[in-house]
Amino acid sequence: MKVSEFRLAVDDEFGAAHGRVLVRELVVDELGGRTADAAIAAGVPVAQVWTALCRANGVPTERRHGRGRPAAAS
């Protein structure tokens, strides 16, 4: 997942305004106590950041593939 795909997925799932707040301010334990933005800046793979953000916000598994990306086979 590219950063641009991550941003689209965040906007699609959470809405543009709320999504920006989440990635900038929500500290996620699964990301080492970092925000999504800080984790990406630290080199954490973007797909891993997306999955952690989804888990932290209770996004159902079937919606975690991200906008424009195929859902994983079950």
Describe each region flagged by the PLM:
Residues 1-74:
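C-terminal alpha-helical interaction appendages
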